[in-house]
């Protein structure tokens, strides 16, 4: 590179071409010159690269430990202690593997994808969402019942990756370390445990389509979703380090486990059957890969989900705890809304039990709690903003069972509404 302008004795920067009159400082080397502006730019580039290297080196140390992960899960999800431990360990090991620099000859560590088994409303989705929040990674959720294998009417499995990309603002690097939760995974089991000779586009076919992205592949994702066509441009996403959590209720799986362990359910065993049904959650806790094969999953798919965690059905006591104890408990949310109106909201113990019992009748687990509360609270939430001098609102069991109006306490006078 020239160190002088050929037309004069003016010195110029060998990198940007600016003359010594255009810059503050020009530093000479053996055959080149560099200006202060280029030096500053080089410093910025080096500093940025150092930050990235430091971040990679310290991410493993910043990763929450399994006990810390479970403690945060306890703040949002009631019960399910063993499932939380399985999730905490699996997630910790997964991200430890992701952040560790793999050297030639190192032991190859496989992904710790997770299968959650448990009844509707037992907390499967909430656990997955909370994990993503703890780890500050993008989270996407998909419904397995909408998926079909490529070429059939329905949603391509690659669109799951698109949802994760959208959650990470199309930052491919961030998306490649995200979490995907696939709900209703039991719905893609084939209809029998023998291989099908006909096309099963929403069962075994979907399992085959999911295999590669769950294990790890470079997926071609249409930026706007929908079906692929040859003229389209695709985003390339490596799914190797994406953690997949699959969940489902698995109705009938407990019967398969009963048959395997030899529980008597006929004749004189009628009483035994009643006891076993009460402990369906305990049966699911003993699930094996062979049980999942009989349920209708192909061996390769079961092999991609090595971590199994079962969730038990919620009882009345757990439902009451869910209403009032978690950080985002429904009762706390409603009380906050009333606080904004400068009104105290109180729920009696009887009202909480009534809400829990109504939810248990609906057999929708914790999901039913919100709709019961919304229905009970609608009228009072409509009226309170327009009323003055209201000091307190009390919700008792009659509001839930008999649709009676809540008790309203005014600033100076207490009376029933």
From Swiss-Prot:
Q: Which InterPro entries match?
A: AAA+_ATPase (IPR003593), ATP-dep_Clp_protease_ClpX (IPR050052), ATPase_AAA_core (IPR003959), Clp_ATPase_C (IPR019489), Clp_protease_ATP-bd_su_ClpX (IPR004487), ClpX_bact (IPR046425), P-loop_NTPase (IPR027417), Znf_CppX_C4 (IPR010603)
Any matching Pfam family? ClpB_D2-small
For binding ATP, which residues are annotated in this chain's numbering?
119-126
Q: Does the entry annotate any disulfide bonds, and if so which pairs?
A: none
Which SMART domains does its entry note? AAA, ClpB_D2-small, zf-C4_ClpX
Gene Ontology CC, one term: HslUV protease complex
Which Gene Ontology molecular function entries are recorded, alphabetically? Answer: ATP binding; ATP hydrolysis activity; ATP-dependent protein folding chaperone; protein dimerization activity; unfolded protein binding; zinc ion binding
Quote the record's binding site residues for Zn(2+): 13, 16, 35, 38
The ClpX-type ZB domain, residue ranges:
1-54
Q: Cite the PROSITE patterns for this sequence.
A: CLPX_ZB
List, in alphabetical order, the GO biological process terms annotated in this UniProt record: cell division; proteolysis involved in protein catabolic process
The UniProt keyword set, sorted, is: ATP-binding, Chaperone, Metal-binding, Nucleotide-binding, Zinc
User: Family assignment?
Assistant: Belongs to the ClpX chaperone family.
Q: What binding partners and quaternary form does the record give?
A: Component of the ClpX-ClpP complex. Forms a hexameric ring that, in the presence of ATP, binds to fourteen ClpP subunits assembled into a disk-like structure with a central cavity, resembling the structure of eukaryotic proteasomes.
PANTHER family (alphabetical):
ATP-DEPENDENT CLP PROTEASE ATP-BINDING SUBUNIT CLPX-LIKE, MITOCHONDRIAL, ATP-DEPENDENT CLP PROTEASE ATP-BINDING SUBUNIT CLPX-LIKE, MITOCHONDRIAL-RELATED
Describe its function.
ATP-dependent specificity component of the Clp protease. It directs the protease to specific substrates. Can perform chaperone functions in the absence of ClpP.
State the name under which the record lists this protein.
Answer: ATP-dependent Clp protease ATP-binding subunit ClpX
Source organism per UniProt: Citrifermentans bemidjiense (strain ATCC BAA-1014 / DSM 16622 / JCM 12645 / Bem) (Geobacter bemidjiensis)
Q: Give me the gene this protein comes from.
A: clpX
